[in-house]
């Protein structure tokens, strides 16, 4: 099955239940990370933490709570969606495919719709498909505004109105490229939908770049870099296709849980030394302690 965070949550002990033995995997929604930080000293086993289902930028959206969690010797490793600073103890977890919004169909049924759409279009237009413009009032709206204004109009076809998901998947699958600016967080379901459909998502460079290593994701420094020459020269290559599937990520989490990884406090301090903020020029730029505190309140 393609990566989706609901399947990851299913393998976890779920907060407020606490891990009971070494190597347990604990899921905590980011809204409850403060409660976990306050209770961390009461947990006496070593566990792996998983957080997702939220657009909180980790660790800087909840900086003090995140530091306390990362400093705990009982936290083996933390896998997080929208992780803006990664190292051995804090690792990316993809947002993946949205199988949780539609409650009337199972994950398997929704995945089959995706697979059928992929198989319905084996010849793809050498153009970009865009449907991100229907939702602009979001945290990273500047990235979508820049994509709208800077991608040459002759290279992209925008959907005129919202269409059902299955129809949307078929439309996406008929294009070689999918424009995927940031969502309300720095990740977007659209990126992973595009990959599952055999398309090439185009994203702007960010703290998420390492998450896409070995996947056919076209990363640009600026949306103004998108050109016909760039599209023509990009070669589809997917040596890390296994990273598209939830089984890979579950295995990675279990592997780390069994490893008993130990990370020194000074290594954590070093990893957190550079902070990130969001601005129109560089989504991963340094910022002051005052700005860290401001971001932590958003």
Model-found features: residue ranges?
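Nucleotide-sugar donor-binding catalytic core of glycosyltransferases
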Residues: 1-192, 196, 200-219, 225-295
